[in-house]
A protein has these predicted regions:
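Bacterial N-terminal signal peptides that target proteins for export
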Residues: 1-8, 14
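N-terminal signal peptide c-region/cleavage motif recognized by signal peptidases
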Residues: 13-20
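N-terminal alpha-helical modules
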Residues: 21-137
């Protein structure tokens, strides 16, 4: 079971990093359209993050409702903490990305590209983190 879990996490890590690398490489290939490319990368990463967030909600439902004979209070408490954690993390991500892009803040296209690249990178990292919470048995 532990080997299977390690293999799963290794696969997810490689998937996230290869998606991130592919996005970076694609954005560099279209030098004149970096801002648009970074925006598309951010949107794709946001979809991945939303999918992983929903998957965690589904795993929590499976664990607390079905596997542990209807522990509704624990399920609700977990979902409340997850929602709070996600909201707090989004504030941190946005603040960190504004900091990373500070030097280009007055150059709108560069600043926008910096923000979107940072948001995509951090969102993919968060998606990987969410995959590790309440792993399926």
């Amino acid at each position: 079971v532990n080997v299977a879990r390690l293999m799963f996490f290794a696969f997810v890590a490689m998937s996230v990093s290869s998606v991130s690398y592919a996005q970076d490489a694609d954005c560099e290939a279209v030098a004149g359209q970096r801002a648009e490319c970074a925006e598309e990368a951010m949107k794709a990463a946001d979809r991945v993050l939303n999918d992983r967030y929903q998957a965690l909600i589904d795993r929590a439902g499976s664990r607390y409702i079905f596997q542990y004979q209807s522990r509704h209070e624990e399920h609700k408490a977990f979902l409340d903490r997850l929602k709070n954690s996600q909201r707090t993390w989004i504030k941190l991500r946005d603040s960190n990305c504004r900091l990373e892009g500070f030097e280009n803040e007055w150059d709108k296209p560069s600043y926008s590209a910096d923000l979107n690249r940072c948001t995509a990178k951090m969102s993919l990292e968060r998606a990987l983190y969410l995959d590790g919470i309440l792993p399926a048995h």
